Amino acid sequence: MIKGLYSAVSAMVMNAVRQQTLSHNIANLQTPGFKQILETSGGFMQGQAVYTTGNLNGSPIEYVGSMGLGSKIGQEYIDFVQGAMQKTDNPLDFALQGGGFFTVQTPDGNRYTRDGRFLRDSENTLVTVDGFQVLDDAGQPIELPDGEAAVSAEGVISVNGEEVATLGIGVFADPMTELQHTEGNLFTGPDASTGEEVPRVAQGYLEMSNANPSQLMTQLVEVARSYEAAQKLVQNQDELLGKTISSLGRIG
C-alpha cells in the first residue's frame, strides 16, 4: 500500500518537473537560436523482490527481480539540433548553418550563442539584442564604420566593400558535454574551438527555435493527464490507508 503511495507521489513530482520544462520550451518557440531542453527519466529506491514459501528465518528465499518505488527525472540536457532558418532581410541578422556559435562578451565573461540578432550601438559596436558585444576571431569587439555592412559565408564582415573584421565563431566537437547553459540563449565552454567543422554564415537570416510546437503541445497534454491519474491514485491510496488504520483500531 505504501509502495503504491510512493509510486503515485513520485509520478506527480516527475510530471510537475516535466510540465515546467515543456512550458519553458513553449515560451521560447519564437526565440531565435533557442535550443530546447530535454529530459530522461529513471527509477529510484530500487530493491530486490523476494519470494518465500514460509517463515523468513527457515524457508529458502528466491530473488525474483528488482522492484522500484517510483520514477524521477534522470538527466536534463540541451538539444543542439539546428532550428529552421527564417529570412528577415535585416543586414545585421546572422544565422549559422551547421555547427558553431557566435562569441559574445558579457559582464560574467565570454559566452556562446546561436542567436544572431545583432545591432549597432551608439558607439558603432556590433552588439546582441541584450547589449553584449559581439567578438571577432581575435576575441575583440567588432567596430562597424558607418555604411552598409555585408558578411561572407566565411564570416568576414565588410563595410562599404572594405573588410573590417571576421566573426569569432566557436566550434565544438561535442557541445552537449562541452557547453553549459547559463541564461537565456547563452552558453559557457572552452575558450578555444575543439571541433573541425566550418559553419557557414547566412546574412539576413535567423535560426529559429528547434522545438516542435505540435509535439510540445501533445506532450503537455500527456503530462497533464498523467499527473491527474497519479493524483487520483494518491487519493485512493490515502482513503484505503485510512480504512485500514480504522479497521485495526476496531480490532484492538
Predicted segments, located by residue:
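Amphipathic alpha-helical polymerization modules
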Residues: M1-G252
